[in-house]
Regions:
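M16/insulysin-pitrilysin zinc metalloprotease superfamily fold
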Residues: 100-106, 136-167, 314-315, 339-397, ...
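Acidic/histidine-enriched segments that form metal/cofactor-coordinating
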Residues: 26-31, 106, 111-220, 266, ...
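Bacterial N-terminal signal peptides
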Residues: 9-20
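Histidine-acidic residue clusters that define the catalytic metal-binding segment
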Residues: 31-51, 190-230, 262-267, 394, ...
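M16/MPP (pitrilysin/insulinase) zinc-metallopeptidase core fold and M16-derived inactive scaffolds
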Residues: 73-136, 199-203, 314-330, 342
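A structural supersecondary motif
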Residues: 80, 288-292, 312-354, 407
Length: 494
């Protein structure tokens, strides 16, 4: 026998001997019997990554050398809530045209070509209460990519032909506002919950879009775009010290006044409880059921999150999904969500889409599940399942350095409680069956529910022969209102 053959045989014998005890371990009868050690995970601390540049810009920064990439994501203190009356859409155009409209030294076409050459992805947008801008590039191209990115932010061209194209596209999109029942439902649900004057319901019109010119974009940009008005989340393949030097240099020439940005007006006004019906010739009706809830600083948010997961937020294991979809087969998608607002209260919303004839019956089933979770304690098994799921999936919030930095930047912008992430799992772990029932009783108030039904109202009213339920029977206080569709260009009702 050759020497290498003897060595191989000896190695195999040793391997078999070592493997024998493992093979002797009992095999679990099912995956449920598998045992795992608890995952030891502590979220990163924001203060370990927070830096203030000389110009006042806040930066959350972390090295991540897993790929040769760099990410810079900015949050800018601005928003469409700042649109002047009669020029709704100005903030949105300012955000989109930052990227699409060129820079001081580059036409829009040259900017496109430059970014393609650098293999850099750049974006910008402005939403209701914040603006954003992002750069993702190869670490080898960082210097040139960052230079172009900062010029775009500081000295946008807002090229006239690109703005004209964006204006024309916006007007064309307006024509489609009533084409999709899902779009109608989402739009009108927000108005029913918070009212026409809420910052989230400032609709663009054909008149407001036509009133916006290049000078308006320049003035809006000049007023709100300054380094001290930005928070950056930076991660990637770099030396932290070197990256901070690059950021200091890139933004050094930008004037640093911090504008007094008006605060968001949180005022809201819900419609009266009842059933609100909107006619749309579609084979399936869309239904939203809910009410305004609490802000993010409420001590009840943890119990409400768990309550909603049990009721309709956890997919096939949740009560609404199981009852409406799995047991009755009335909807492909049915569930609920619970949001917690930063400026105004968030909301609870249960929703589904069902055949017209079964809309009322499905709505009755959802309301019955709401009643049950108020009046009957959830089971210990339901509670533990949801608590364990929330605790075990918690680390995924911080799956990458980039995600973590973005969370810290968002928290700084919205002033989230500093201990939220460090205390989250303990607060979830401490919840009891009584806590869940308490918040259900306090916040899911049947007499205050709003029901929005979008679909073929004649078919919906005919109902299901096996389950002859009428929407009028479900209306809180017996109130029923028919809402006509808005004119897509003026957003006025006839």
């Amino acid at each position: 026998m050759h020497a290498h053959t003897k060595s191989t045989a000896a190695a195999l014998l040793v391997a078999c001997a070592l493997a024998a005890p493992a093979a002797a371990q009992p095999v679990p009868e099912s995956p449920d019997a598998l045992k795992f050690q608890p995952l030891a995970f502590e979220p990163p601390r924001a203060r370990d990554h927070r830096v203030v540049l000389k110009n006042g810009m806040l930066v959350y920064i972390a090295e991540d050398r897993t790929l040769p990439l760099v990410s810079v994501a900015l949050t800018i203190r601005t928003g469409s809530y700042l649109d002047p009356a009669g020029k709704e859409g100005l903030a949105g155009f300012t955000g989109s045209q930052l990227r699409r409209g060129g820079t001081k030294s580059l036409t829009a076409e040259e900017l496109d070509e430059k970014l393609d050459y650098l293999a850099a992805q750049v974006g910008a947008a402005i939403g209701d209460t914040a603006g954003s801008a992002s750069l993702n590039c190869l670490s080898d191209n960082l210097d040139e990519s960052l230079k172009v990115f900062v010029e775009m932010l500081r000295e946008p061209r807002f090229q006239e032909d690109r703005l004209a194209l964006a204006r024309e596209q916006a007007l064309q999109e307006m024509q489609k506002r009533n084409d999709d029942s899902a779009v109608i439902e989402r739009r009108e649900w927000g108005v029913l919950l918070y009212g026409e004057k809420h910052f989230s319901n400032r609709f663009t019109t054909d008149a407001s879009i036509k009133a916006i010119g290049r000078d308006d974009l320049l003035a809006f940009h000049r007023k709100y775009f300054h380094p001290a008005n930005m928070i950056a989340a930076v991660s990637g393949s770099f030396s932290k010290a070197e990256m901070l030097k690059k950021l200091e240099a890139a933004f050094a020439a930008w004037p640093t006044p911090k504008p007094a940005v008006p605060p968001v007006d949180p005022a809201w006004e819900s419609a009266a409880p009842g059933v609100y019906r909107m006619q749309k010739d579609v084979p399936q009706g869309r239904v939203s059921i809910g009410l305004v809830g609490v802000k993010r600083d409420s001590p009840d948010i943890y119990a409400l999150e768990v309550m909603n997961e049990i009721l309709g937020g956890s997919g096939f294991t949740s009560r609404i999904t199981r009852t409406v979809r799995s047991n009755e087969g009335l909807a492909y998608s049915a569930g609920s969500g619970m949001g917690f607002g930063v400026y105004s209260p968030g909301s609870f919303r249960a929703s589904f889409q069902s055949k017209s004839r079964t809309v009322a019956y499905a709505a009755q089933l959802v309301l019955e599940e709401v009643r049950k979770i108020r009046e009957q304690p959830v089971t210990a098994e339901e509670l533990e399942t949801i608590k364990n799921n929330l605790i075990q999936t918690f680390p995924s919030q911080f799956a990458s350095r980039g995600q973590a930095m973005s969370i810290f930047a968002s928290d700084e912008y919205t002033k989230r409680a500093p201990d939220y992430w460090t205390s989250y799992r303990d607060r979830i772990r401490a919840l009891t069956v009584a806590d869940v029932q308490r918040v259900a009783k306090a916040h899911l108030l049947p007499e205050k529910l709003i029901l929005l039904v979008v679909g073929d109202q004649k078919e919906i009213e005919l109902g299901d022969e096996k389950h002859p339920v009428k929407l009028a029977e479900l209306a809180p206080g017996g109130k029923q209102v028919t809402l006509p569709l808005r004119d897509p260009l003026t957003m006025k009702r006839p």
